């Protein structure tokens, strides 16, 4: 799902940070922190509700997403 916009389905998504926030705008840093990601390589699982999907779509260039 990397690079593609995802939809809110209620499924569980596994989100992995693959790029650093160094050089990114502050809103990108804040979005990753809101998702619970602190460093590249870290993985979190989140429910695919509207708020989470919106955050993921904001930082698609920094994360990889797969269905859990």
Curated annotation (Swiss-Prot):
Record's keyword annotation contains Ribonucleoprotein: yes
The UniProt keyword set, sorted, is: Ribonucleoprotein, Ribosomal protein
Q: Which InterPro entries match?
A: Ribo_uL30_ferredoxin-like_sf, Ribosomal_uL30_bac-type, Ribosomal_uL30_CS, Ribosomal_uL30_ferredoxin-like
Record's keyword annotation contains Ubl conjugation:
no
Q: Which GO terms describe its cellular component?
A: cytosolic large ribosomal subunit
Question: Which terms in the Gene Ontology molecular function aspect does this entry carry?
Answer: structural constituent of ribosome
What Gene Ontology terms for biological process does this UniProt record contain? translation
Into which family does the record put it? Belongs to the universal ribosomal protein uL30 family.
> Assembly and interactions?
Part of the 50S ribosomal subunit.
Question: What is the protein name stated in its UniProt record?
Answer: Large ribosomal subunit protein uL30
Species source reads Kocuria rhizophila (strain ATCC 9341 / DSM 348 / NBRC 103217 / DC2201)
* Encoding gene (name): rpmD
């Amino acid at each position: 799902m990397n690079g593609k916009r995802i939809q809110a389905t209620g499924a569980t998504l596994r989100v992995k940070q693959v790029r650093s926030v160094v050089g990114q705008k502050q809103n990108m840093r804040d979005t990753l922190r809101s998702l619970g990601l602190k460093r590249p390589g870290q993985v979190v699982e989140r429910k695919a509700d509207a708020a989470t999907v919106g955050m993921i779509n904001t930082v698609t260039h920094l994360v990889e997403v797969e269905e859990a």
